[in-house]
Amino acid sequence: MAQLYFYYSAMNAGKSTALLQSSYNYQERGMRTLVFTAEIDNRFGVGTVSSRIGLSSQAQLYNSGTSLLSIIAAEHQDTPIHCILLDECQFLTKEQVQELCQVVDELHLPVLCYGLRTDFLGELFPGSKYLLAWADKLVELKTICHCGRKANMVLRLDEQGRAVHNGEQVVIGGNESYVSVCRRHYKEAIKAACCS
């Protein structure tokens, strides 16, 4: 039975690695996968899902105007697909998450979504909000803070390495701009940034 999965975490927990491994597992069995990634995130190249450990795969791009249902249905009609995998799902719109539900319910295809739960202010991203609400299965991928506790928050850093406590929700960056931390160290960093 097909289901909608949401694998979520803070940054650097291995979401892209897990996506690539899942896709490989299907392909190894002779099954076709369709991989998507957000057009806005081109840190590792356009149309590429890349992991920090060196794995990568080509992917179709999506943006806020992309009809995922139309693309998936057309691809599936042309050559059967066995699994849909999407990276950077925090950037999905409400409508796109609804379309992914349709892919599961009407096309009977499993959909595996990978993304951040919250932004640098601790607020849900739109895509994450609706995936948390509508996914059949929620799976937290864990990473650790520098203190050894589970990291469930993301700090955005300025050029001097200080926490940023306001600004646009989406600013694309990697390890130089963001760090995953536990809630305690998140609060300490934000407090220090607000008081300086």
From Swiss-Prot:
> What processes in GO biological process is this protein linked to?
DNA biosynthetic process; thymidine metabolic process
Sites where the protein binds ATP = S9, A10, M11, N12, A13, G14, K15, S16, D87, E88, C89, Q90
Write out the similarity annotation: Belongs to the thymidine kinase family.
Q: Which protein is depicted?
A: Thymidine kinase
Q: Report the top EC class in one word.
A: transferase
Its taxonomic path starts at:
Bacteria, Pseudomonadati, Pseudomonadota, Gammaproteobacteria, Enterobacterales
Q: Where in the cell is it found?
A: Cytoplasm
GO terms, molecular function:
ATP binding; thymidine kinase activity; zinc ion binding
